[in-house]
Amino acid sequence: MKVARSKWTILIANILVPISILVFSSGFFPYKTLLTGFATHEHTIGGQIPPGVFDKVLLLQADFHASDFVYSQHSGFLFTQRLGGGFLIRSGAALPFTAYASAPTVTMPRLKAITTGSVPSFLDVILNIAEADTSSTLMHQDTWLAQLKAKGGKLVMYGDDTWLKLFPGMFHRADGTTSFFVSDFTEVDNNVTRHIPNELLQDDWSAFIMHYLGLDHIGHKAGPNSPYMITKQHEMDSVVSMVYTALEQEKHLKTTLFVLCGDHGMNEAGNHGGSSVGETSPALLFISPKFQRLETRNDSPTEEFSDLQYYHTVEQTDITPTLAGLLGLPIPLNSLGVFIPELLAMWDHGAKSIPLTSSSGPHRIHMLLENAKQLLGAVKGSFPSYSFEFDLMPVICSSQSLIDIERVQCAWFRVLETLNGSGANHDSEASSEIESALLLFLRNAQKLMSSAASDYDLIRLYVGLSISGFAISLTFFPAKRLLVNFAPAGMFLGFSILSYSTMMFASSYVEEEQQFWYWISMGWVVYLHVKYAGHFHGNSIQKSGPANGHWPFEPSLPWFGAAALAVSYRVLRRWNQTGQKFAAQPDITGSFFPSHQHTLWALLSLAASDSPELLGNSFLQPVAMLTDGMHLLYHARMVLCGISLLMIYSLYAGKARETTHKGRGKWPPSTIFHETLTLFLLMQSKVTNIPAFLVFRVQITILASMRLSTVEQTITSLLMQYVTFYAFGGSNAISSVDISNAYNGIGTYSVFIVGALTFISNWAAPIWWVSASRLLRSSQNREEKEAHVTILTLHMATILMSVMAACTTLRTHLFIWTVFSPKYLYTIAWAMINHIVVNVLGEIDWRLFMKR
């Protein structure tokens, strides 16, 4: 009865884990409250509408367009830097900026920032992968595209189909390409370029959007320093040349604004999503022959900056009000952007007409006034209890210590005071004073609104915490009884759980979590060495007990096996440098393999693919002849089908063997299943990570030669899952998510399949260790297997609650969206998929099909 009760207790605890996640997430990631409707010019002070300088916009959006790609001396954008005998930027035809892109630096949130001017929700990180999702649409939100559409303009778009998902039915002509086939460097861009010559001849569009993906795909597959990168930069530069030439030659394009920008950058590993300098510093250029009259002169190319802040740095959200103003459109209601001051010169600074309080006046002043009133409306909507009446100014602004909202109030009062004091005085000095006051207010308001805490649902946060706490209480006492029987190992596990839980409240430790697992695993090796130094033996694994004949090795290991285990851990630690502090340090995959490629390919030699002539008259020759000339997609599908058949066979054979009570052979079904799974995981891993599976083999062979207890086997499995995840380049940053293998064998997009393959490719090493540890535990009885699940559940529930508690306590922390929120998303993946699906449900599947 006690065993049955314990079983139901653990089942309930594992059900409570996803429930707690759903409840907590609904309070932690609420949809933002936005102002409804669309902006109009009716709200402009004095009724003055600043005239548009341009009537068309051509946006060239280059995914992963870091600032140094355009501005540095090593850039491939030669035409962008050089125009004839001079320089495009130096001539003033292009105004260069670095546009700061706040985290999360993935495409969908950044496109929302560029088109609405607002700071996107962190939940868009998930929606960025779910391409079929429609909840992220901007169809009913105020954007500069919607304003153009309302004005009667036609929009065309070619490239990343994220635009089609954000703006369904808005484009007059469009041809979208999925952004996740990252192995494609050429077709995704050629599909855009082929439309350009014809579209440049058309005069019916008001906005022409081109979104190129090639740079981003090269970065994901080979990193930002790939030799393919400079070639792709030359290709993008040729597109700039084509467009700019058309602006000069085509009459209907004389009043067209050309904007070249990136949605995000990329880190040294070739990924993005986080907040490193490389990820948050894309380039931004406003290009038009009209800008030459401003007589702006900038050096180009320029010296390199380690922080990538070339020229003047603006916020990416500033693009929205700037485009709206230059095109003569109302600024979208929810925009937090500030009109870029350098472009105000497109209106006459010295215009002298009549007082600013009347219906006319310097257009640049009215542009900033419109921007200020729009942003003031957003501030009032978020802080309804604060008044912006001028009469309150002496009371509030006399204080020496002001909070952010009070600084915004005082800045607005300063604007009103300056406007009222100017009266009929409309000379250049008065205009400059008003501009300064307006820009001060705009920057303060932008800072306030961009950093304002989300509207958390605290009740749901606390309920989610309580549910996870209840899951811990359900598993604590069953696990305690198990751990007490194995005191040293139990104390070690308890210490690691408490240490980890405490560590989650420090942002630096969260960023460098891999260090915790590396050190704790080395401590575990020391423990195993002290306990089992005298128990290494030369017998086969079958005689030692744990593997029970299910492991295909019969090692003869001496007493120094623990030392070899420690060395292997050290190798894994340097396999991929991850985290933030040491990410740029030399490692095996980034430093050794690139300079010793013969070593890598010796480990990965695939004669059938690279040298089919070496097959000779072997039995594989017919296979090579059959697949000769076949599309690579079908190659991948054939391999996946073969792997699937082997897995099905191993499961069926295991069930049949249990039914017929046949004896065990050298290759029992459980081993076949594991080896087949290994083949699949190799397919889903980066090429440079594949040799690490050999290190895993060495480790599991050593561990199989020890007489580990039930608890020790569980702790070993748990530690290895986390250690190898970070050894393969994982971290707590969104930018470490690898999508380079998310489309293996897939011809069309499927959110479920792509999501599953993305998880498998990033958790390939932990999945391997879950399977390998089952072979290690194959001699365990039912109670021992349930004890294994109990300990894992206690560990996962405690980790989940500690991360939830940290996110709740530190919800107003500066790094809540760059450190703690990504950590929470990773914890969801660890709990929902790795723990429940791979560990718990996988254990049930193993017991159903494999003979114990």
From Swiss-Prot:
Record-linked SUPFAM superfamilies: Alkaline phosphatase-like
Enzyme Commission identifier(s): 2.-.-.-
Transmembrane portions of the chain: 458-478, 486-506, 516-536, 632-652, 676-696, 714-734, 750-770, 787-807, 824-844
Top-level taxonomic group: Eukaryota
Signal peptide: none
Keywords of this entry: Endoplasmic reticulum, Glycoprotein, GPI-anchor biosynthesis, Membrane, Transferase, Transmembrane, Transmembrane helix
Group of enzyme by EC: transferase
Glycosylation site positions: N191, N420, N576
Topological category with respect to the lipid bilayer: Multi-pass membrane protein
Record carries keyword Transmembrane helix: yes
Pfam families: Phosphodiest (PF01663), PIGO_PIGG (PF19316)
Single annotated GO MF: CP2 mannose-ethanolamine phosphotransferase activity
One GO cellular component, as annotated: endoplasmic reticulum membrane
Subcellular location: Endoplasmic reticulum membrane
Transmembrane helix as UniProt keyword: yes
InterPro entries: Alkaline_phosphatase_core_sf (IPR017850), Phosphodiest/P_Trfase (IPR002591), PIG-G_N (IPR037674), PIGG/GPI7 (IPR039527), PIGG/GPI7_C (IPR045687)
Family named by the database record: Belongs to the PIGG/PIGN/PIGO family. PIGG subfamily.
Role according to the record: Ethanolamine phosphate transferase involved in glycosylphosphatidylinositol-anchor biosynthesis. Transfers ethanolamine phosphate to the GPI second mannose.
Protein name in UniProt: GPI ethanolamine phosphate transferase 2
Source species: Aspergillus oryzae (strain ATCC 42149 / RIB 40) (Yellow koji mold)
